[in-house]
Amino acid sequence: MITSPNLPPEMQREMLRRMLTIRRFEERASADYLAGKIYGVVHCYIGEEAVATGVCSALGTGDRIISTHRGHGHCIAKGADLNRMMAELYGRQTGYCKGKGGSMHIADFEIGMLGANGIVAGGISIITGAGLAAQMEGKGGVAVSFFGDGASNAGPFHECLNIAATWKLPMLYICENNMYAANTAAAATHALSDVAARAAGYGIPGVIVDGNDVFAVYQAANAAVERARSGGGPTLIECKTYRWRGHTERRGQADSRDRAEVEAWQRKDPIALIERRLRDQGELDDGALQGMEGDIMAALEAAVAFAEASPFPLPEHATDDVFAA
């Protein structure tokens, strides 16, 4: 059962569109990676689309986020350009980082996407600094840290929650608990079953939501955003979810997880849940869904064509853009 939303129908349909865009982008990225067209490594966000979409739907254009190694969904949910994203995955000059960052290091400061980070928990400190900057700016901005259950065991998580709570920084800490850090089950490394319980140690709210229910995620994030904007300080939100794919997209990669567990979570598909809700409300039919899918696939084909037509970075530019000035 998905949460009953009190949102305009057009906003609900936009949430579905974002989630479908993330799913189709990831499917194409995986296929192109396995075909040898994308370099480096790809971590798919399939199954977790409701988290990025629900949180980013509660944000304004001036709010800032930071992502993880599994970051394509956050970029798309925050409004990133598909052409530049795909070009970056393809390692082309027209990509967000001129083809030098790849899948794990996409950034677009203009939309408030401060980047993704290949180091587990590496972004938490950076975005907490952005929260301090937002507080000092005094314009009501908030900062959002996305991270996984594995990162919640790292030092930066605890250090940043402590300082954010002490200084009442306008922060949202979003734990995407997909139950595994790479191939290690959270149950094997967490003394408590809920990451959100750790919020009590810092005197801040710890909220648990169904990470497959985009409306529940939105409601929790929206309440936390309102609290942060009003000076109430940070909130830790734990989104219980699941990644459908292995840790990375690799041909022949063994998945240590129980197949029955994977299939059980796939039956709780976050996209199917929101589709069903919109149909029940009379806000979506087959024609509208097919039109939405068609637009998304056309945009992805255009993004791939843009990437393939773009040049690779030149070797003599390898050290360009290392420093800000």
Where are these regions (language model features)?
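Charged, compositionally biased N-terminal leader segments and the immediate start
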Residues: 1-14
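Short gly/pro/ser/thr-enriched loop/turn and capping motifs at secondary-structure boundaries
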Residues: 73, 179-182, 216, 243-245
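Conserved thiamine diphosphate
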Residues: 135-139, 191-223, 267-293
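A short, conserved beta-to-alpha structural element at the edge of catalytic cores
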Residues: 167-187
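Glycine/aspartate-rich loop-and-adjacent alpha/beta segment that forms the canonical ThDP
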Residues: 227-325
